[in-house]
Amino acid sequence: MSVTGLPFDDFRVLLRDLPGPDSQALVAARDRDRQLTKPPGSLGRLEEIAMWLAAWSGRAPAVNRPLVAIFAGNHGVARHGITPFPSSVTQQMVENFAAGGAAINQICVAHDLGLKIFDLALDYPTGDITVEPALSERDCAATMAFGMEAIAGGTDLLCLGEMGIGNTTIAAAINLALYGGSAEDWVGPGTGSQGEMLERKIAVVKQAVEFHRDHLSDPLEVMRRLGGREIAAMAGAILAARMERIPVLIDGYVATAAAALLKAANPSALDHCLIGHVSAEPGHLKAIDKLGKTPLLALGMRLGEGTGAALAAGIVKAAAASHTGMATFEQAGVTNAGTH
């Protein structure tokens, strides 16, 4: 326990001492990969993914209990008319998820993925970030802790997504605070903002970052001031997964912004994470580049709700299955290039 006892203190301690990869599991996976019936490197990124799974799960690559976790939150900044949809759509989409009617439901069925939906005080939008912090430190820390519970039921691959009207505005503000540049660099159409609405969105992001500019050197302060409940919850889930050695797939622009806050706090904080896809939101590729990551997919999607991460989970499952299920040269009676 720290001397101050402030709500963020426990998270600061966790972020300072993150567990690393399992070197023995990685060595074992590399040894097996060299024996499989294929030329070295011929499966490309599938081989890299298998090694990543081994290193961060501490065992032979396997995906037996994949889970998509979607966090939903509402934002006070939406009152500025920055999106074509009202905030009530967040609750309506949560109900659609529960009824099995959304795109993510179909992708989860297709790839045999579990799905959990977490609605985060939807009747109580966060503060309007142009004039006040989104959350108090206590509320932000509590929401991070709630997000950590995403893994409570057990999973060996966590896919993170979100739902929240106005949250691409939030993501743009976070990226501007972390990386600089102009608001125009980070603001895109989101759910369809165009023309004057897009100009309002840009102005709101500028105003928010300017209002909080004296408090943006600390990533956790950026989170509570410019973020939202789904941002805090996803950050908590990523952190919990790291502590429990669970590999993570991050979805789109908003989920990437949540992840970026952790990397800003500790450069190694996302080593157990891959980016599922690059979305069509203009700032997403720039944000991914800032993290030093390469997305698994580029399908022109910009839906959110974990869809890109869920699709990428199919690739990760295939990587694990290839590594564990393929025969070795000896088992198959196939001559290895290095043995004749």
Swiss-Prot record:
Transferase among keywords: yes
EC number of the protein: 2.4.2.21
Molecular-function GO term, any one: nicotinate-nucleotide-dimethylbenzimidazole phosphoribosyltransferase activity
HAMAP family in UniProt: CobT
Active site, UniProt feature: E305
Pathway: Nucleoside biosynthesis; alpha-ribazole biosynthesis; alpha-ribazole from 5,6-dimethylbenzimidazole: step 1/2
Biological processes per GO annotation: cobalamin biosynthetic process
Pfam family name, one: DBI_PRT
Family listed: Belongs to the CobT family.
Record protein name field: Nicotinate-nucleotide--dimethylbenzimidazole phosphoribosyltransferase
InterPro entries with a match to the protein in the record: Nict_dMeBzImd_PRibTrfase (IPR003200), Nict_dMeBzImd_PRibTrfase_bact (IPR017846), Nict_dMeBzImd_PRibTrfase_N (IPR023195), Nict_dMeBzImd_PRibTrfase_sf (IPR036087)
Family matches, as NCBIfam families: cobT_DBIPRT (TIGR03160), PRK00105.1 (NF000996)
UniProt entry keywords in alphabetical sequence: Cobalamin biosynthesis, Glycosyltransferase, Transferase
Catalytic activity: 5,6-dimethylbenzimidazole + nicotinate beta-D-ribonucleotide = alpha-ribazole 5'-phosphate + nicotinate + H(+)
Keyword Transferase carried by entry: yes
Superkingdom: Bacteria
Function: Catalyzes the synthesis of alpha-ribazole-5'-phosphate from nicotinate mononucleotide (NAMN) and 5,6-dimethylbenzimidazole (DMB).
